[in-house]
């Protein structure tokens, strides 16, 4: 069975194309949604069903919060809390249901077997990450270490199901090491766990993680479509549709939160797609996958460094309120719009980070076959993050009337 799944998931490589990217990006949307009737049918039965299932599940969870609220409600107390109303933090259930329904809705189409194989692998392998995250949402007693190991276990399980692991990153020496299966699997598990936890760490404001995830999935899907990997492109579309259903209830008013279960599941899905894209398509630089994920990765690395080395006595796993999104809310939104409600200020924060996310994602699409271009874009993205963070942390870029605060 593993061999069969691996044949479906990995057994094809998209052809390199000589035409420029400028001539391919715009036709993508036309060919995807208008020009090809079979693709339009897939959109109707897969993505729309995923979005509808996710949205309906969110509505149901919100309407029944009096039944499950004693377990699922996110308290308003805490250093990282930016909401004023008790809110269910189990939106990950809705996203998982949406992806599952999208998977089931594609069963009528024999041509979608490859996409179903990818989705089934994501659903099955993502369960450890999702379950441990959901347990934390419901009990608040699952340690950071246990959740990290669960996300890494999802990466190993993904390899066990599909046989796919990172075998090249275009780095001399490291590529040779990745030729050994054990090293390749462990490296993949570490990368998957890192991205999953990075997605969780940026989950701080209404619409932030969902919006960032939609942008990242769009970039992955667009690259997959450009190199002819239709199955992976539509996998991204189905997952994005499930996220979109949740997004409607999460932004801007925050009727339901993603929770650790949703963040870890989405983080795993993104990480696994990041692994699949260059492994299935030899023409795609692995650095483009890293570039798409660079915002949450930079956030988690900088947070660990800040807590461990810049804040004496602060545990690297303990939460704080000085992430980039936290500073953007306090230094920009609250100063520029002091008379708006807290919930409105909350909803206004995410778009600032969406804009930041779009830049590296656009560069990843543009340079997806160019290692130098992606590496330079990575450096620019990291330097931009540091520059913005320093400006906000040291009370610059504030409205003039509040400069003495």
Predicted regions, residues:
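"…together with the soluble PPM/PP2C metallo-phosphatase catalytic core" -> "…together
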Residues: 36-301
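Hydrophobic membrane-spanning alpha-helices of multi-pass integral membrane proteins
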Residues: 99, 242, 346-364
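Cytosolic, membrane-interface loops and tails of multi-pass inner-membrane proteins
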Residues: 63-88, 302-343
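Juxtamembrane "helix exit" motif at the C-terminal ends of alpha-helical transmembrane segments
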Residues: 103-110, 359-373
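N-terminal amphipathic/basic-hydrophobic helices that include classical n-h-c signal peptides
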Residues: 1-38
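Structural signal for the N-terminal portions of transmembrane helices
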Residues: 281-292, 360-361, 370-377
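Internal alpha-helical transmembrane segments of multi-pass membrane proteins
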Residues: 144, 207, 339-347
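Alpha-helical transmembrane segments and their immediate juxtamembrane interface regions
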Residues: 128-140, 366-405
